[in-house]
Amino acid sequence: DRIVAATQTGMRAIVIGANGRVGTRAADLCAAMGVAVTKWDQAETASGGPFPAVLQHEIFLNCILARPGCPVFVPASAKTDPRKLTVIGDIACDPTSDFSPIKVYDRVTEWDAPALRVAENPPLDVTAIDNLPSMLPVESSEDYAMQLLPSLATLTDLEAGVWGRARAD
């Protein structure tokens, strides 16, 4: 309900990982709904944080591939810190990892109960469904096909290119 209300109240979303497939689509969805979008990627997070700007958006969509050394975007203190943030969509969904960039929750959510309330005043809800990126099967299939097609086109020469490198000794 709050996301729908965002289109009428001038809420803002921040998408981190905005240059990737999932982040691009997340930003597109927000824009299509009339939600103002701040797009961040590696350049904007290279400083390592902290990132108080994340807490000044009402919606945060995490679309990164978290790895060791990943900065924290939402610290545990965000539950009680002054903030505008009320909705987190952790599309990357890696809450139990030591390098999760979102420290306000510790478990995935499910389709039958997609939101987890982690703070009350103001409310802060997290959606973290571990198979959510699979909702983009067409985009994933097209991207995979475009990556595979050049290799398939050289299948007639098994000694060259990727086929030659893949050959067992």
What are the language-model segments listed below?
Residues 5-11, 34, 74, 80, ...:
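Extended interaction regions within the primary functional domain
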Residues 1, 93-169:
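Adenosine-phosphate binding glycine-rich loop
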Residues 21-23, 68, 96, 134:
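Short, acidic Gly/Pro/Ser/Thr-rich loop/turn segments
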Residues 43-122:
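Rossmann-like adenosine-cofactor binding region
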Residues 37-39, 88, 126:
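Conserved beta-strand scaffold positions in the cores of enzyme catalytic domains, especially
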Residues 27, 31-35, 66, 149-160:
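Generic secondary-structure signature for well-ordered alpha-helical cores
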Residues 1-64:
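Glycine-rich phosphate/diphosphate-binding loop of Rossmann-like nucleotide-binding domains
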